[in-house]
Amino acid sequence: METGILIVIFISCLLVSFTGYAVYTAFGQPSKKLRDPFEEHED
């Protein structure tokens, strides 16, 4: 394989992994630990 193809595959895997981790953090089990600053603010 060409070096360019391997680099593109590597960067694509990194991007997909980061996106999956971000979705898991936002909506998965760790999301219960996140605080909502809008709910903490009282008018």
UniProtKB/Swiss-Prot annotation:
It is found in: Plastid, Chloroplast thylakoid membrane. The keyword Metal-binding does not apply. The chain crosses the membrane at residues 4-24. It holds the Pfam family PsbN. One of its GO terms (biological process) is photosynthesis. GO terms for cellular component: chloroplast thylakoid membrane. It comes from the Eukaryota. InterPro entries: PSII_PsbN. The keyword Chloroplast applies. It is a single-pass membrane protein. Keywords: Chloroplast, Membrane, Plastid, Thylakoid, Transmembrane, Transmembrane helix. May play a role in photosystem I and II biogenesis. Belongs to the PsbN family. This is Protein PsbN. It comes from Coleochaete orbicularis. The lineage of its organism: Eukaryota, Viridiplantae, Streptophyta, Coleochaetophyceae, Coleochaetales.
